[in-house]
Amino acid sequence: MMKKIKLTRANKSITLKALALYYYQQRALGHNTQESGRLILKINSLPADKKASFSAEEIFLMRSTINQLRNDQLAKGQYTDAADDMLLKLF
């Protein structure tokens, strides 16, 4: 199932930040990074403020990585507005 999501510049930025942290963590552990790497390249190539189609697996990966980033920001006492906005789009 494909879902169309409009990505603003802030949405792209927070998603790429979350995916990059996940990518480097998985690479350090020696796990497969092909799926997350492909998604990073896909999101990076998208123009801002345009709708893009994402599969259920891609949405799950984005949702889980952004949620982890949000939890890390909350633990540090940082603002989570950008992560919250993107999470709402993914549900």
Q: Model regions: which residues?
A:
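Positively charged, low-complexity terminal tracts
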Residues: M1-F91
